[in-house]
Design a protein with these regions (language model features):
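Noncatalytic alpha-helical scaffolds and linker/capping helices
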Residues: 38, 393, 430-491
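Phosphate-backbone binding interfaces of nucleic-acid-interacting proteins
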Residues: 1-195, 199, 307, 332, ...
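Terminal amphipathic helices with adjacent charged low-complexity linkers/tails
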Residues: 178-211, 384-398, 430-444, 448-451
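Conserved catalytic alpha/beta cores of large enzymes that bind or transform nucleotide phosphates
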Residues: 123, 226, 294, 300-397, ...
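Conserved mixed alpha/beta core segments that line enzyme active sites in large multi-domain catalysts
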Residues: 47-76, 235, 252-321
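Intrinsic disorder/low-complexity segments
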Residues: 397-430
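Conserved phosphate/anionic-ligand binding catalytic regions in large, soluble enzymes, centered on
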Residues: 2-3, 7, 81-89, 163-182, ...
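Glycine/proline-enriched, intrinsically flexible loops and inter-domain linkers
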Residues: 4-5, 23, 63, 182, ...
Length: 491
C-alpha cells in the first residue's frame, strides 16, 4: 500500500526526517518497503503557456511551439507530445534547467529546428504520471511561475500492513496510529452526520445471502454532473498510484484511501427495480470494470438488480455495464460489509483483485460502513451536485465473534455492540465501541517485566483510542476500528 506523507499530515503532524518517520510506522507492526521523495531537484522549470503551434517540417509527429514563460518574448520549444493544444499550460524546462535524476536540459536543435527547452510530463519531474503525455496544468496559474511553487513536496511510502491490522489500510487509520506512537495530536476526518436520515431499505435492497452480506447501505443521488475531478482530488489519487477517471469514481477511491471504506457507485439507469445480493448462478458471467469477462459459480456473491442481472462481484469489482460514465445523471452509492472469507475465495478463484477486495479480505470495520457513505455523499454533492435520498439500510452488522462472547467486565452489562439499534431520522449513528477486554495490571507487570508503569500503560491505551470502564480501571472498551484487540495479551 502506498501512503502520502503530505496527506497523512492532514491528520497528524510529526516533524521528523523521512527515515525517522518511516521508523515510527514500523512500530505499528507494518513493514516499510521503501520511500521516495517527490518535488525536489527541480531547477529553472516554470509554468509555460502554449501560444502557437505548427508542424515540424522534418517530422510527422513533432510540433514547434511558441511558449509564454513569463518573459518579454516567448521561447520556441519543440515537442513530440500529442496531448498539447494552444492555450494549454504545461511545465517548461528552460535552458540549463535541472530535473530529478541529474538530468540537465539545454537548448539545441531537434531535426534542424531550434528548441530552447523541453515541455515536461509529470514523470519527467519525478512525479507520478497524471495523464498520458505532457502534464496539463490548471488554467489559473500564471506563466513564469516556478514549478516548485506548483508541486507539493511529498514523500511516498510503500508499506506492507500485517493481515491482523486492517485498520491501518487508510491514511486516516495510519495517522491515528502514528499520533499514538509519537504522542502528537490527532485530527480526525470531519464527517457531519447530523442531517443524515436512515431508513429501512424495504424492497429497495434485498439480502438473499445474509451470512455472506449481512449489512448493506445504499443512497440514491439524482441529478449529478459527471465531470473531471478538481486538481486537489486528482493529486491525492495520483500520489497513491491511481488514475483519475471522473469525479464520482474518484470520490469513491478517495474515501477508500482516506477512511479505508470500500465503496461502489452504480449508474441508477442501469439498475432495474432495486438491489439484490445473492450467490451467482452456476456458469453466470459478468464483464467487470477491468474489461474482462468472468464465469462465476454458486459460491460467488454478486450484487444484482431485481431483474436478475448481475451488477458487480460482491466485494471484488463492479461490472462494466452498470458503471458510471459521462452520460450518467443518477447514481446508487453502495457501502456494505462482505464476509472476508467469501471475498477472499472469489478473488483467488477468479485471479481478480482490487483495492476493495484487499480490504474486505482482511476484515473491514462495520462501523466504517456508514461513515464512508456519509463522507462520500457529502463530497459528491459538493463536486457533482444532485439531491441525495435517505440512506437505505438493509440487514444489520454482525458483532466481532470474539467480542460477542466476552463476559461482563466489572460493573458493566456485558459487551457493548457497535451495532446498537439504528434510529430513524436525523443524526442516526452507531455506538463507537466493539466490546470489552480486561487487562489485569499484574498481567501487564508479568509481560513487561515491570518496565511499564500502570499510569504509562493507561496513557498508551488511551492514546490508541481505548477507554477505561468507570469504576473498573482494568477493563477497557475497544474502539470500533480495532478488530484485532480481543484478549488481554493483545493489549
Amino acid at each position: 500500500m502506498k501512503l502520502s506523507r503530505e496527506w497523512l499530515g492532514e491528520y497528524t503532524t510529526i516533524g521528523a526526517p523521512d527515515k525517522e518517520y518511516c521508523d515510527a510506522m514500523t512500530l505499528s507492526g507494518s513493514k516499510v518497503e521503501g520511500y521516495e521523495v517527490e518535488g525536489t531537484e527541480i531547477e529553472n522549470v516554470v509554468v509555460g503557456k502554449v501560444l502557437a503551434m505548427e508542424r515540424h517540417p522534418n517530422s510527422d509527429h513533432m510540433w514547434i511551439c511558441q511558449v509564454d514563460v513569463g518573459k518579454s518574448e516567448p521561447v520556441q520549444i519543440v515537442t513530440g507530445a500529442q496531448n498539447v493544444h494552444v492555450g494549454d499550460l504545461v511545465p517548461a524546462a528552460l535552458h540549463k534547467s535541472h530535473l530529478p535524476g541529474g538530468v540537465t536540459i539545454t537548448k539545441g536543435k531537434l531535426r534542424g529546428v531550434e528548441s530552447r527547452g523541453m515541455l515536461c510530463s509529470a514523470s519527467e519531474l519525478g512525479l507520478p504520471d497524471k495523464e498520458h503525455g505532457l502534464w496539463i496544468l490548471p488554467q489559473e496559474l500564471e506563466p513564469g511561475t516556478p514549478i516548485s511553487q506548483v508541486v507539493k513536496a511529498d514523500t511516498l511510502v510503500e508499506v506492507e500492513v500485517t493481515p491482523n491490522r486492517p485498520d491501518l489500510l487508510s491514511h486516516n487509520g495510519m495517522a491515528y496510529e502514528l499520533a499514538a506512537i509519537s504522542g502528537r495530536g490527532y485530527r480526525p476526518v470531519s464527517i457531519d452526520d447530523a442531517g443524515v436520515a436512515l431508513e429501512p431499505a424495504g424492497d429497495f435492497v434485498r439480502l438473499d445471502q445474509p451470512e455472506l452480506n449481512p449489512y448493506y447501505t445504499a443512497v440514491k443521488i439524482s441529478g449529478v454532473k459527471v465531470q473531471e475531478s478538481p486538481e486537489w482530488l486528482k493529486e491525492r489519487l495520483v500520489a497513491v498510484g491511481l488514475r483519475p477517471i471522473n469525479n464520482i469514481v474518484d470520490i469513491t477511491n478517495f474515501v477508500l484511501h482516506e477512511l479505508g471504506t470500500p465503496l461502489h457507485a452504480f449508474d441508477a439507469a442501469k439498475v432495474q427495480g432495486g438491489i439484490v445480493t445473492r450467490t451467482a448462478y452456476e456458469g453466470e458471467t459478468i464483464k467487470a470494470l477491468d474489461g474482462q469477462e468472468y464465469t462465476l459459480n454458486c459460491t460467488d456473491l454478486v450484487v444484482a438488480d431485481q431483474s436478475g442481472k448481475a451488477l458487480a462481484i460482491g466485494g471484488v469489482m463492479g461490472g462494466e455495464e452498470s458503471g458510471v460514465t459521462d452520460a450518467t445523471t443518477d447514481i446508487i452509492l453502495e457501502s456494505a460489509w462482505f464476509k472476508p472469507s467469501s471475498v477472499r475465495a472469489t478473488s483467488r478463484r477468479l485471479a481478480l483483485s482490487s483495492d476493495s477486495s484487499y480490504r474486505f479480505e482482511r476484515g473491514t470495520s462495520a462501523w466504517n460502513v456508514l461513515r464512508g457513505s456519509v463522507r462520500a455523499v457529502e463530497l459528491i454533492l459538493q463536486l457533482a451536485g444532485g439531491t441525495a435520498s435517505p440512506t437505505y439500510v438493509a440487514g444489520s452488522p454482525v458483532p466481532n465473534p470474539a467480542h460477542a462472547s466476552m463476559p461482563s467486565c466489572g460493573g458493566a452489562d456485558g459487551p457493548v455492540s457497535v451495532f446498537a439499534s439504528l434510529k430513524q431520522g436525523k443524526g442516526a449513528t452507531v455506538t463507537n465501541e466493539l466490546g470489552f477486554v480486561q487487562l489485569p495490571w499484574k498481567a501487564l507487570d508479568q509481560i513487561s517485566g515491570g518496565s511499564i508503569s500502570h499510569e504509562e500503560g493507561a496513557r498508551i491505551l488511551t492514546a490508541l483510542g481505548l477507554k477505561q470502564v468507570p469504576d473498573s480501571p482494568e477493563c477497557w472498551l475497544i474502539p470500533p476500528h480495532r478488530l484485532d484487540l480481543t484478549r488481554p495479551c493483545d493489549l
